[in-house]
């Protein structure tokens, strides 16, 4: 069994507004997905992210830290959340990614986690 991180990227400009029926439908879809992941014993961690404007990037060059508000790349899709799941192999990770609601209209990027 290996752990994988699932990074959910979506178009923030198309994200439903707080309190809208569309957002409630998305919340319901993620709750159903989370229930399925937990029932399978695959869930380790996961949470949504705040809007991209709340994020920041830090880089260090020549010993000097530079902090930039907002997403690292202005035109990039929004990293709106993540899951860490235990999967028996890549095929199972691909199956969970395909079921993730963010993959339907967005992208779920999957990385195996290197255990040290």
Where are these regions (language model features)?
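Conserved, structured core segments of small domains
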Residues: 1-116
């Amino acid at each position: 069994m290996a752990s994988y991180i699932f990074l959910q990227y979506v178009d923030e400009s198309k994200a439903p507004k707080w309190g809208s029926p569309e957002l409630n439908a998305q919340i319901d879809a993620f709750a159903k997905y989370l229930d399925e992941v937990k029932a399978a014993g695959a869930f380790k961690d996961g949470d949504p992210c705040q809007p991209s404007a709340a994020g920041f990037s830090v880089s260090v060059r020549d010993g000097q830290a530079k902090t930039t508000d907002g997403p690292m790349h202005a035109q990039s899709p929004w990293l709106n959340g993540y899951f860490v799941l235990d999967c028996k192999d890549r095929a199972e990770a691909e199956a969970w990614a395909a079921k993730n609601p963010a993959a339907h209209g967005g992208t779920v990027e999957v990385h195996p986690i290197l255990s040290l």
